[in-house]
From Swiss-Prot:
Belongs to the OMP decarboxylase family. Type 1 subfamily. Homodimer. Catalyzes the decarboxylation of orotidine 5'-monophosphate (OMP) to uridine 5'-monophosphate (UMP). This is Orotidine 5'-phosphate decarboxylase. It comes from Enterococcus faecalis (strain ATCC 700802 / V583).
Amino acid sequence: MHDRPIIALDFPTQKEVAVFLEKFPKEEALFVKVGMELFYAEGPAIVRWLKEQGHDVFLDLKLHDIPNTVEKAMTNLAKLGVAITNVHAAGGVRMMQAAKEGLIKGTQPGAKVPELIAVTQLTSTSEEEMHHDQLINVPLETSVIHYAKCAEKAGLDGVVCSALEARGIQEATKQTFICLTPGIRPAGSAVGDQQRVVTPQHAREIGSTYIVVGRPITQAENPYEAYQEIKKDWSEK
């Protein structure tokens, strides 16, 4: 597991991100997530700016398209030097293989290839919704583990999943396979639009490699204090 929780920068503009980051010590190197809202508003410049501030970036765009398109997109994203990026496992093994090839092609000589992970089922998706909307008539965990095995077959580094599925995925894949888990909430906090949530401590105990935390930090009265508490809960054994 990695000791820094990933902070979801779910803000609409770089200006708001800058205001938020001012609440942290300048020397604090963070691991942050840039999702669709922020990336589509600010473009690649937001990633470059965050890296200039000394932060690691998980670029969460969930690519899902034909293999050729995804490969070319990943070649360009690799040039940004992000630490992690992702695709939708539902795009299939060929698409995921193409994504990995694109990342390798786009990574600068001597630089580390970004970790590539696949989204299995969104943590906002309930089993009932999966059955009704996606016509996937197996238990939700079975679907998630199937997608994880497809991602492993494609040569990906891991998956995005609920911590509730992490142990099953680890039993079905190689030991180094990553389980990055959103839907993390400290004890007693609101779950919002998430369906399958756990605490940082529980995520650690059941096998998460990385955790992503958004509103419990970004909307806290004291974000740095909230971050430190979550980091402690996540990293202490």
